[in-house]
Each structure stands twice: as structure tokens, then as C-alpha cells.
């Protein structure tokens, strides 16, 4: 499997989702730019998947529900309109010391892998979470022989960790998580935009 990297925007929105609902499990999707055919890649191009954005899905009880199907369909359509592809899944469990993927996480990630062969499953480690974001809080899993296995936990999976650390800490300090919209919020009020343009602008402003 190629390497995996997250942009600052993707990492920050994952962190903010967990911060908004600290006593709940949360999950979401990670999107990458749609890949060109392999023959179009320039010689020597690095082989890795770059998650450019994060789409927060649900908080509370995470299950394989009709609403998940609705979310996947809508987000897949949005991705096609913007030359993206659903390429990963993230989840933070309810219990602080539980950072292992459960059946829901593995099933959703496996479904994504059917459409994107290099899909990744990212588990957020709540035990590592601090307001100053001193260390990355993620574990990256890859699918190998139909099983999800944890990749090197010491590897840096952020495109620019110092930037991601600084901006996520700044957004937490300003309580930006209060304005984050996940798909649950969108279902409660369809005017709520799950692409989170305001947070995207805040990240860009801080870069």
C-alpha cells in the first residue's frame, strides 16, 4: 500500500469533530484528489495517498444505518463534482483508552476499499488528545488479506505536522469546534453545510 498523508485541513477537522463531542464516538470520511491514470504520472512521482479533506459524519451511536447510506451517496456525488474520491474513514471511540477499530469501522472502511483500493482506516487515539496538540493522535490501518492492520505508529502521517499542530491548537483555543457541522447536524437542519467552508477558511487564514 502506498504511503498515507493528511493535509492540515483534514487533520484539524478530525480533531475538531472529536473536541465538539468529547463524550461521544464520532466518525467521518477522508477524501483524496481523484488520481490520474498511472501512465500519466510523471516519472519519479511519489506514491502516496494525500487526504485533502475530512467530512465529519456522525456522533453518538455509530452503526450501519440507512442514514449512513444517504451520507455516502451524497458525499460520493459531491466528490465527483469536485474531482475527489472517498479514500478513507476515521473514527474516535467513546472510551478514552479504546483506539481499536470495531466492526462498524472495519465494515465501512472495507466498503470504501471496494471503490478505492488504497483506502485507509484511521483511528483517533483519545488518550493522546491535548488542547495544545502536542503529538499526533492517529493510528493508520491498512487492509491486508482482508484484515485491517495498524501501520507503523511512529511514522509521521501529516503532510506538515508543525503546521497541523499549530493550527489545530489555535482552532481549539478559539473554540472553532463549536461551529463544526457533521452530517448529523445537517440532518437536523439541512442549511448546515457539512463541507464546513468557514473552518476551511479559518485553516487557510492560519497557514
Swiss-Prot record:
Membrane topology: Peripheral membrane protein
Domain of life the protein comes from: Eukaryota
Paired cysteines (S-S): none
Keywords (A to Z) from UniProt: Endoplasmic reticulum, Membrane
Gene Ontology biological process terms, A to Z: protein insertion into ER membrane by stop-transfer membrane-anchor sequence; tail-anchored membrane protein insertion into ER membrane
GO molecular function, one term: membrane insertase activity
UniProt cross-references to CDD domains, sorted A to Z: MPN_UPF0172
A GO-annotated cellular component: mitochondrion
InterPro entries: EMC8/9, MPN
Domain named MPN: residues: 4-147
Protein family (similarity comment): Belongs to the EMC8/EMC9 family.
Role of this protein: Part of the endoplasmic reticulum membrane protein complex (EMC) that enables the energy-independent insertion into endoplasmic reticulum membranes of newly synthesized membrane proteins. Preferentially accommodates proteins with transmembrane domains that are weakly hydrophobic or contain destabilizing features such as charged and aromatic residues. Involved in the cotranslational insertion of multi-pass membrane proteins in which stop-transfer membrane-anchor sequences become ER membrane spanning helices.
Quaternary structure (record): Component of the ER membrane protein complex (EMC). EMC8 and EMC9 are mutually exclusive subunits of the EMC complex.
Entry protein name: ER membrane protein complex subunit 8
Taxonomic source organism: Mus musculus
Amino acid at each position: 500500500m502506498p504511503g498515507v498523508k493528511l493535509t492540515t485541513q483534514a487533520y484539524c477537522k478530525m480533531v475538531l469533530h472529536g473536541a465538539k463531542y468529547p463524550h461521544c464516538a464520532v466518525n467521518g470520511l477522508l477524501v483524496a484528489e481523484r488520481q490520474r491514470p498511472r501512465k500519466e504520472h510523471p516519472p519519479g512521482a511519489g506514491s502516496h495517498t494525500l487526504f485533502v479533506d475530512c467530512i465529519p459524519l456522525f456522533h453518538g451511536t455509530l452503526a450501519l444505518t440507512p442514514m449512513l447510506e444517504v451520507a455516502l451517496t451524497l458525499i460520493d456525488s459531491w466528490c465527483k463534482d469536485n474531482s475527489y474520491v472517498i479514500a478513507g474513514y476515521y473514527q474516535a471511540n467513546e472510551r478514552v483508552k479504546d483506539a481499536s477499530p470495531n466492526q462498524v469501522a472495519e465494515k465501512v472502511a472495507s466498503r470504501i476499499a471496494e471503490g478505492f483500493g488504497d483506502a485507509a482506516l484511521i483511528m483517533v487515539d483519545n488518550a493522546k488528545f491535548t488542547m495544545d496538540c502536542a503529538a499526533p493522535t492517529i493510528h493508520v490501518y491498512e487492509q491486508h488479506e482482508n484484515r485491517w492492520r495498524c501501520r507503523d505508529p511512529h511514522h509521521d502521517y501529516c503532510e506538515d505536522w508543525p503546521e497541523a499542530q499549530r493550527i489545530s491548537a489555535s482552532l481549539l483555543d478559539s473554540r472553532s469546534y463549536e461551529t463544526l457541522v457533521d452530517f448529523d447536524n445537517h440532518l437536523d437542519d439541512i442549511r448546515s453545510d457539512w463541507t464546513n467552508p468557514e473552518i476551511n477558511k479559518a485553516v487557510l487564514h492560519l497557514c
